[in-house]
Amino acid sequence: DNTQEIAEKCQLEFKNEEKHLPGFTAPNGIKNSAYLRKLCFEGFKEKMPNADASNAERLEYELSVIENMGFVDYFLIVWDFIDFAKRNGIIVGPGRGSGAGSLAAYCLNITDVDPIKNDLIFERFLNPERISMPDFDIDFCYERRQEVIDYVVQKYGENHVAQIITFGTMAARAAVRDVGRALHMPYGDVDKIAKMVPAELNMTLERALTISPELNLAYNSSSNIKTLIDFSKRLEGQPRHASTHAAGVVISKHPIMEVVPLQKNDESVTTQFPMGTLEELGLLKMDFLGLRTLTVIRDTLDFIGRSGKEVPKLDTMEYNDPEVYAMISRGDTDGVFQLESAGMRQFLMQLKPDSFEDIIAGISLFRPGPMAQIPRYVSAKNGMEPVTYLHEKLQPILKNTYGCIVYQEQVMQIVRDLGGYSLARSDLVRRAMSKKKHEVMAKERQNFIEGNEEEGIPGAI
């Protein structure tokens, strides 16, 4: 009772407006914003020598957003440790996630994906209408990832860098087994009940009772099993254990112990707050992902060199070898990153990709949600049904994906071109859709219909 009374009397409000970004020191006393601009336009001239004025305007726009949102140092910090990696022969991935939509990142060699050629949108990464920390997901050779982290620790000080805690939560089956053990129920009986829970991603006990007749019957036939499931439902989703995040590293302007509580986890120092809380507190979180596929690529290139053959340059390779596409279309993709699962191989044999765009679309389709589009996409791609569009304005947006909405960028382009949204506002719609915010989507549905009518498009579309 006293604890509750004290809690009710406390009115502390955390002020999280401050960003704890570490400072970057540009050489020769140059202002950081000027140095970032210099690096970007040097890369722009090198990578896009034939670019038109609209491309330069986009880079100018991105730089103004980066500066106005206070993320100049962030871009320079990321550029610096990626530059270190590349100078020291550490293979770095070409870029993944929303960061690949930044032309500035492409010009800085943070990513190797041309966002203009691939129709990627900067506002999905950095939105002036939604103030949040940017987040580059960066892959490094698995065996040399630690060298990059060590460089960051050395540059910014070990008291300013820490790894991040993560909490494993009780999934449905695990909750049943743990509760059964606590209730001293026979293991065989508990295991039998646990196996009645469908082994699907994000399965909950509530949903399992709905879709598993066997589990539902057991629940309604036995008071012991009902007690087991009811207790398990209360524990489901609760933290079960703590571990160190596989890739996350936080870098702070101030000594990190002054900003968040720390703990020792094996040999590393980790934060006691998880990633989401750290971002809310304005701390810089980086994902240093160790990817074994990059290590295999490194070893392959080394082997080619030792064999006396010319080593291919990854940044100038063409993606148009028909023999490679024939191999992929046969489902012969063991060990190929993101194409090696049994389900994906089966899908590739149906899809029969003959371009790099087909592979990108295939990876995007083969996940919950877009999977519903697979039959239509495959039929249209292989000429078994015509490609149709609800409105002519959808054709340039959906042409490359045979009339199917596959990418989140396409959602943003649709609400912009048909509903009159800005790209920044269209990102808010994309985000609400991905987070399943039904109230926001209901409101935006009406806004979109009204925008359609203003653009001369029937609201029913």
Question: Across the structure, where does each feature detected by a protein language model lie?
Answer:
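Alpha-helical scaffold/interaction cores of sigma-54-like transcription cofactors
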Residues: D1-I461
